Amino acid sequence: MSKSENLYAQAQQLIPGGVNSPVRAFTGVGGIPLFIERADGAYLFDVDGKAYIDYVGSWGPMILGHNHPAIRQAVIEAVERGLSFGAPTEMEVKMAQLVTDLVPTMDMVRMVNSGTEATMSAIRLARGYTGRDKIIKFEGCYHGHADCLLVKAGSGALTLGQPNSPGVPTDFAKHTLTCTYNDLASVRQAFEQYPQEVACIIVEPVAGNMNCIPPLPEFLPGLRALCDEFGALLIIDEVMTGFRVALAGAQDYYHVIPDLTCLGKIIGGGMPVGAFGGRREVMNALAPTGPVYQAGTLSGNPIAMAAGFACLTEISQVGVYETLTELTDSLATGLRHAAKEENIPLVVNHVGGMFGLFFTNADTVTCYQDVMNCDVERFKRFFHLMLEEGVYLAPSAFEAGFMSLAHSNEDIQKTVNAARRCFAKL
């Protein structure tokens, strides 16, 4: 029995499913999850001593690669001053200034501890600000595990085959209207059915929780126009895309202005951090200046702020996103060519530093139904073949992949060569 197998057997007796987040259990692909001992650069090293080229990147945060020296040093220095104070710090102010400088649509920002906290709080704020109850989200999009958002959600919910989670009261879910991603007509229909009741739309600008689905050109501008027409707020959930698609996020890449933005993953540099922010008028409705309550014991803690500040400082350097995009383009092109050589039908979507693989005969994949029509069983086989080759992809057909600046051209060529061998076995 390998060390991973032994640890998993122990973990299953102590932790539900043996993991602290469902997708890690390999439920979506079968088999025993890897237990990781350490990571460095573009590589993970499991407890059995095997190395893997990593395209999960801790599910997005590791844009600089693992164990980056600047982040590591910032954390060490912060730890020496104390772990948490329960009081404001200078680093919170510096971090808020940096975030609002980098994302111009955010006049003000509130730090939290996770992406789920960010989206949950932003929706509460939108409801409080507008005095309305209903929200619009999109089928297959995942915005964390808050009750109102686990309605036809993507990501882990899709991986488990449970689009709706037990434990979410019907009375909560009835306020969530679900529309079709990339389909403006479905959104207009929802607004027209409840013209004075919708507080906000929340949307992933690139849907990264039903793999990787970029928006059609008219989609995000159309959402902005509909929100303006019906008096609702537009919340762009950039937990995944923020600082990954572009320095100012997917909202800048696609030229759309939200009322509120949610951030996570990269903003923490690998530490648990989330944030939400937006127009000053809306943000001032938050306690203590306004009536909408939100709080957190460890929000803005000095260790996480130090890691996040170091990460954002590094990725603000000239040429970072050109390099990241070139690396992702190279991987996507190589995978397409390798699949074609082996007569494997494959669609590869990619934007900035994220990508998605779809085993399908379709020419494009643009919505939830397209994703559900893909060959999940073939993905499962491909995943395990690649794992044997030393390439770690997301263990689910419904999760995006992530490039880092630590990946080299050699890493990408190794990945493409491995994929070619795996395609030949499918």
Curated annotation (Swiss-Prot):
Ranges in a coiled coil: none
Catalytically driven reaction(s): (S)-4-amino-5-oxopentanoate = 5-aminolevulinate
Cofactor(s) the record lists: pyridoxal 5'-phosphate
SUPFAM superfamilies given in the database record: PLP-dependent transferases
EC number(s) on file: 5.4.3.8
PROSITE patterns, alphabetized: AA_TRANSFER_CLASS_3
GO annotation, cellular component aspect: cytoplasm
Modification N6-(pyridoxal phosphate)lysine, positions: K265
Pathway: Porphyrin-containing compound metabolism; protoporphyrin-IX biosynthesis; 5-aminolevulinate from L-glutamyl-tRNA(Glu): step 2/2
GO molecular function, one term: transaminase activity
InterPro entries: 4pyrrol_synth_GluAld_NH2Trfase, Aminotrans_3, Aminotrans_3_PPA_site, PyrdxlP-dep_Trfase, PyrdxlP-dep_Trfase_major, PyrdxlP-dep_Trfase_small
GO terms (BP aspect): protoporphyrinogen IX biosynthetic process
Signal peptide positions on this chain: none
Location(s), subcellular: Cytoplasm
Presence of keyword Cytoplasm: yes
PANTHER family the UniProt entry points to: GLUTAMATE-1-SEMIALDEHYDE 2,1-AMINOMUTASE (PTHR43713), GLUTAMATE-1-SEMIALDEHYDE 2,1-AMINOMUTASE 1, CHLOROPLASTIC-RELATED (PTHR43713:SF3)
Similarity section: Belongs to the class-III pyridoxal-phosphate-dependent aminotransferase family. HemL subfamily.
Subunit-level organization: Homodimer.
Protein's name according to its UniProt entry: Glutamate-1-semialdehyde 2,1-aminomutase
Originating species: Yersinia pestis
